[in-house]
Swiss-Prot record:
InterPro entries: Amidase (IPR000120), Amidase_CS (IPR020556), Amidase_dom (IPR023631), AS_sf (IPR036928), GatA (IPR004412). Keywords: ATP-binding, Ligase, Nucleotide-binding, Protein biosynthesis. It comes from the Archaea. Gene3D superfamilies: Amidase signature (AS) domain (3.90.1300.10). One of its GO terms (molecular function) is ATP binding. The gene is gatA. This is Glutamyl-tRNA(Gln) amidotransferase subunit A. The keyword Membrane does not apply.
């Protein structure tokens, strides 16, 4: 019975101490489960009875949509985002809203107003961010699957650290309607799941053209394909910036593709040094623009008076480089760099089907450990390129180091989501 499964998850969440959830309504979800059991029309749907957690920056009517910030602590969603409507139409249940880095501005899961989320696989370590609660909830078996958002690695980073599967679709494949913006030209909603097959199925449900989101795209259903003859690229620079222990695990993973009949091709990407400055300059400007609505009149409190240190840092830098006298010096140059980086990435995919490598260059630090902003941003060096270039990328488990999971990142060209998802499934089945 669906109600029994919901009750079991609610009990596990209640007993859990990893701080994965911000808002729960057990009475509501149990009633929805009872109604679902009686709904004959939904019984053959692809997500019938699946219990899904949702990151707290995706609107769900009647739940607290706080973006893990004091700024929006009293804000309740007044409508369902497009992806939530799609989940419900396929028979899924929303169990609650998950913790995250405040306004998705972080890579650790530590900047939430509600306190840090713990990594279920290493309780003294960060789970990664910003979709920390969604990844941790899936990892700790507190739900069947979850939704997160990915601006520069926010699905893939915690997927790697928590030992789950994460997928960032091509920009536009999934509607952003109902998502609270961090950086609108980077943001993308995607799944966090226990298996790669589940990521394929969940992506197929949430994707598609949405007339209320002009950047959304119409795409055919993604199917699992043979990858036997694929050319798999390995970028030297991605491996070079990665800790040796992680690199060793990734190299074992690359051999799985060789054993599957793929050709391994060595590649070079000359703009790795521009990845972080380009990403963060654009991120700062777009985030500053996105936060102007949090003025204390329309939504919640004045953001600058209520937010945490990292969010305030991004707002102040974004304001500074948005000013007319500086925009040409910083922002316009970042846009020019982005154009060159995309061109270079397209060139790589002209010679290979996919690129595989590490997700995060270092192991997660201990919760509360002091890191400088630049040390924290370094977590993102291998994931931001996917968002800068508007391509797709997934993460699957690839071993562990003293029990701490390592994730293999599989990148595909724009709209090659089907290839990436197929490779994720094949890798997981043969690792």
């Amino acid at each position: 019975m669906i109600t029994d499964r919901v009750s079991d998850y609610l009990e596990k969440i209640e007993k859990s101490d990893i701080n994965a959830f911000i808002d729960l309504n057990g009475e509501r979800v149990l009633k929805e489960a009872k109604d679902l059991e009686k709904n004959e029309k939904l019984k053959n749907k692809s997500l019938y009875g699946k219990i899904i957690a949702v990151k707290s920056n995706i609107n769900v009517e009647g739940y607290k949509i706080s973006c893990a910030s004091k700024t929006l602590d009293n804000y309740t969603g007044t409508y369902d985002a497009t992806v939530i409507k799609k989940l419900r139409s396929e028979g899924a249940l929303i169990i609650g809203m998950t913790n995250m880095d405040e306004f998705a501005s972080g890579s650790s899961g530590e900047t939430s107003y509600y306190g840090p989320t713990k990594n279920p696989k290493a309780l003294d370590r960060i789970p990664g961010g910003s979709s920390s609660g969604s990844a941790a909830a899936v990892s700790a078996d507190l739900c069947d699957m979850a939704l997160g958002s990915d601006t520069g690695g926010s699905i893939r980073n915690p997927a790697s650290h928590c030992g789950v599967v994460g997928f960032k679709p091509t920009y536009g494949v999934v509607s952003r309607q109902g998502l609270c913006d961090l950086a609108m030209s980077f943001d993308q909603i995607g799944p966090l799941t226990k298996t790669a097959e589940d990521s394929l199925n969940l992506t197929n449900v949430i994707k598609g053209l949405d007339l209320s989101n002009t950047t959304s795209l119409k795409t055919p259903k993604f199917e699992k394909k043979e990858i036997k003859d694929y050319k798999i690229g390995v970028v030297r620079e991605f491996m070079d910036v990665t800790d040796e222990k992680i690199r060793n695990e990734i190299e074992k993973g690359i051999e799985v593709f060789r054993d599957l009949g793929c050709e391994i091709v060595d590649l070079s990407y000359k703009y790795i040094d521009l990845a972080l400055p380009t990403y963060y300059l654009i991120n700062y400007v777009e985030f500053y623009s996105a936060t102007r609505k949090y003025d204390g009149r329309r939504f919640g409190e004045v953001i600058e008076e209520a937010c945490g240190e990292e969010v305030l840092r991004r707002i102040l830098i974004g304001k500074h480089i948005s000013e007319q006298e500086f925009s040409g010096k910083y922002y316009k140059k970042a846009l020019q760099a982005r154009k060159e980086m995309k061109k270079e990435m397209i060139g790589l995919f002209n010679s290979v089907d996919l690129i595989v490598g590490p997700t995060v260059p270092k192991l997660p630090h201990k919760i509360g450990e002091e890191l400088s902003p630049m040390e924290m941003y370094a977590y993102d060096v291998l994931t931001v390129l996917t968002n800068i270039c508007g391509i797709c990328s997934g993460v699957v488990g690839c071993g562990n180091i003293n029990g701490i999971p390592v994730g293999l990142q599989i990148q595909g060209a724009s709209l090659d989501d089907e290839k990436v998802l197929s490779a994720m499934i094949e890798f997981e089945n043969n690792y």
